[in-house]
Amino acid sequence: MAEKNDYVNRELSWIEFNYRVLSEARDKSTPLFDRLKFLSITASNLDEFYMVRVASLKDMVHAKYAKKDIAGLTAKEQLDKISEKTHQLVDLQYSTYNRSLVPALKQNGLRIVMEHEDLTEDEAAFADEYFHKNVYPVLTPMAFDSSRPFPLIRNKTLNIAALLKKKNEKEAELEFAMVQVPSVIPRIVELPEEKDENGETQRVVILLEEIIERNMQSLFLNYDIVASHPFRIMRNADFSLDEEEAVDLLEEIQKQLKKRQWGEAIRLEIESNVDKQLLKILKKELSISSEDIFQISGPLDLTFLMKMYGLDGFDHLKTPKYTPQPVPELMNEDNIFTNIRKGDILLHHPYQSFDPVVNFVRSAARDPEVLAIKQTLYRVSGNSPIIAALAEAADNGKQVSVLVELKARFDEENNINWAKMLEKAGCHVIYGLVGLKTHSKITLVVRMEEDGIRRYVHLGTGNYNDSTAKLYTDCGILTCDPQIGEDATAVFNMLSGYSEPRAWNKLSVAPLWLRHRFLRMINRETEHARAGREAHIMAKMNSICDKEIISALYDASCAGVKIELIVRGICCLKAGVPGLSENISVRSIVGNFLEHSRIFYFFNDASPEVYMGSADWMPRNLDRRVEILFPVEDENLKEKVIHILKLELEDNVKAHLLQPDGSYEKVDKRGKVLVNSQDQFCEEAIEMAKACQESKDPAVTRIFQPIESSNE
């Protein structure tokens, strides 16, 4: 029986993951502008972590919730450890920015003016003119005194606080004022180019808050500015819904979204050299504790680096953009339904294009033989071709049912808008099941054919989002297997009504019996090992923190099952611990694409079973969400999926190995052939498309041009 010391705290494991992302920003072999991108990602990750996870723990402390977590820690103990670890993380973020990235940018023709005092005379004149023309009319200076309450400060906004003293009054008391840095004006302001010490042309940028701070005096004309400092607060953005009581779920979520801007302040970021009196005022008025204050040496909110990554003219300092390749099975003149009837089709994004998924829905919308389209949507893009196709299908008189998950965190507003639009177009829109998030990725197309009705299904590990499909690694299958079609119909009947099938053919659905299915397959390997037979599990996912699953894996390890896990993010399991998990290895791959697919392999006494799905090994996925696990049965496709797992297990460039003490270390690649799995998948996708093209047209053998994605 595993003890509490045999598990890692979920939040601390997440912080370890953010350190792995930060290591990409610190790695000098990573292209310079990619390093900016990775540092920006660590900052946005930390923001969300505070708004959701830290906020939730604070709610537990307020509610005197005493239950301990998987690692035996109370909410208060977790908060203390989180504060210590995140302060260390932030210090490392800024030493990376100040000591490594800023000097490297200067060497490569981009100077960042760190403080407005460093502006040259000409730059200062340009900045002042820019302020008066573009910024000053937008600003709203706010004072705070007995007649004016402390200003309401929105979540995540950047502000400048100031201490003022009335001019020509020696005994005047210090007064507090502030101004919000407007988000409607670009934060990165480009100044006129200059020549560096070698006579090379150099671009120069400064941040908007520095220009405002330089011109604070013009906002408070009758005052002297005693001190001014940028600051930023993070608020509790975690909301809970009483879905049983909510008459209109859509309306209730809209109400809660408004509250999110004004939740309890849970984190304050401010300059490290802040005036003590000014900090005291902020601390008191925001009711924030010392451990939640981050004094920072550098610009607040490093997410601006993503905008800097997007600056024109620096493509030579970025990883070359990869164009997703066409899928060989679809590189012909047949329509998508004819191609699916030839056999199941595996899709591997972003190495292969997401276009076939869009085309599947679009073709169904326009095909006169299609009777119905049913789809679940969790996160979609801002200008979604999938949504457009569903609306077109309804307009063409087809039965269109769409489950839009309104509770997809931070996409609630987006999804509400899409739900309203689809309803107007004539689609049946379902808002999900009470108490459950629908996280499964499934599309069902019902088509009338010569031999009767045929069902076509797309199942995937990732969202129906054509934008993130270029950045996230995911897998999907297009099939017309009658048993999967029957199960797909049952899934949608369960979502739209109250019916639950007596039995499932091939799909495993959470929260009904997916947990049981996983445990059964893990325990089957344990039994094989105990009987002296070869036993092997390979599994890839985003996170693992389910105690029952981890306990079953520990038992399997002790029985001699070889267990190889690829876990990008949170891992509450301890690997390589003698007598507990010596047969378990865990690796995390952090590369140019976000690893997002969920793939599961069980050796099963030399009759291997391979599955893919939408669920991680977490309680929320197995117990509180609608998730789907689907089998890969075609032997050719099974080999391809096993190849994905094996290549990632060979990665020695972007892989980090979990150590028995809970830390992660990069793979030792000395004397080894370098294997970067993401780069290799790109090369393989290009080769497969090229080979397919050549087999059709030998004239293209000399030069192959990757086919551009229509989503670009």
Which residues fall in each region the model found?
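Hydrophobic alpha/beta core scaffold segments
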Residues: 562-566
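Cofactor-pocket helix-loop regions in the catalytic cores of large enzyme subunits
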Residues: 542
